[in-house]
Amino acid sequence: MDYSMSTALYDIDYGMSEPCQKIDVKQVAARLLPPLYSLVFIFGFVGNLLVVLILITCKKLKSMTDIYLLNLAISDLLFLLTLPLWAHYAAAEWDFGGAMCKVFTGMYHMGYFGGIFFIILLTIDRYLAIVHAVFALKARTVTFGVVTSGVTWVAAILVSLPDIIFTRSQKEGFRCSCSPHFPASQYQFWKNFHTIMRNILSLVLPLLVMIVCYSGILKTLLRCRNEKRRHRAVRLIFAIMVVYFLFWAPYNVVLLLNTFQEFFGLNNCSSSNRLDRAMQVTETLGMTHCCINPVVYAFVGEKFRSYLSAFFRKHVAKRLCKHCPLLPRETPEPASSVYTRSTGEQEISVGL
């Protein structure tokens, strides 16, 4: 789990000028986090599992965008599968041993970074489809999507390695913890590196890519003659950027303040406790982005919603209502090449 999140679960923090009691923070976490994590897990798991099932059974992964959407959903599922254990950890202690501590820490961070990287790829994919449409016909193939997805997973594993290596389960006070333990001689370096890397990769880089790509997309869309579709596309772009910023910026700001408490004059017990509580709230807020991803990247497409309706008619309605009137048959999609435009692209004809 994230470094700053785990520190809030200790009874005492000896990093202050004098020992700082963390019992109140632990009690708040024990009451607040388990139900919040459970809600995020339920809604996020259902939404992302539906995306995976529809992409595989209905869309058949016919485009590069489908490949990226599938991997984004898998990243979110990997991340979400760790939440039940973190919920138990917040309420009690780590009861699952050292091996599980490392495994679930790895799943958490690979899902976290993988999700961010695939959002970046989807942003670039949309940019190519709209701004460089001719080039995109040759470049945006299923094969290229599979290759870049493989490279992206390798990158997600590499940036997760420090957390996997330094995280371990051990007895801390009266409870067993699962948290990072940096070498004492390099403690400050690794703590600062961890925070700066996370801020760059999860906030600065995605927002920079979004600003550059969506600025180019907006310039192209403003020349679109279909005013209704143009306005819909502009609203969608604005919503994607605002949602990402609102969900992840608070967490990254609090993480920065928490790591550099002395620099910001916050290295006292009361400030540390407030930052720990803020970390609990903002990280949970960031986690809920996993529930939003299926909506803004998949279900917003009219064609994807038709696949969702067909999926429920075929796999759910028939089982729940065996004696209902004959359900309308789904219309098969005409065969298409690897260059077929994806769900979001069909929605406004150019890539969103």
Swiss-Prot record:
Its main location: membrane. It is a multi-pass membrane protein. Residues 59-68, 125-141, 219-235, 302-352 are cytoplasmic. The modification Sulfotyrosine is found at residues 3, 10, 14. A lipid is attached at residues 321, 324 (S-palmitoyl cysteine). Keywords: Cell membrane, Disulfide bond, G-protein coupled receptor, Glycoprotein, Lipoprotein, Membrane, Palmitate, Phosphoprotein, Receptor, Sulfation, Transducer, Transmembrane, Transmembrane helix. Residues 1-30, 90-102, 167-198, 261-277 are extracellular. Gene3D superfamilies: Rhodopsin 7-helix transmembrane proteins (1.20.1070.10). It comes from the Eukaryota. Receptor for a number of inflammatory CC-chemokines including CCL3/MIP-1-alpha, CCL4/MIP-1-beta and RANTES and subsequently transduces a signal by increasing the intracellular calcium ion level. May play a role in the control of granulocytic lineage proliferation or differentiation. Participates in T-lymphocyte migration to the infection site by acting as a chemotactic receptor. Disulfide bonds join 20-269, 101-178. The modification Phosphoserine is found at residues 336-337, 342, 349. Residues 337-346 have a biased composition (Polar residues). Interacts with PRAF2. Efficient ligand binding to CCL3/MIP-1alpha and CCL4/MIP-1beta requires sulfation, O-glycosylation and sialic acid modifications. Glycosylation on Ser-6 is required for efficient binding of CCL4. Interacts with GRK2. Interacts with ARRB1 and ARRB2. Interacts with CNIH4. Interacts with S100A4; this interaction stimulates T-lymphocyte chemotaxis. This is C-C chemokine receptor type 5. GO terms for biological process: calcium-mediated signaling; cell chemotaxis; immune response; inflammatory response; positive regulation of cytosolic calcium ion concentration. Belongs to the G-protein coupled receptor 1 family. One of its GO terms (molecular function) is C-C chemokine receptor activity. It is found in: Cell membrane. Glycans are attached at residues 6, 17. One of its GO terms (cellular component) is external side of plasma membrane.
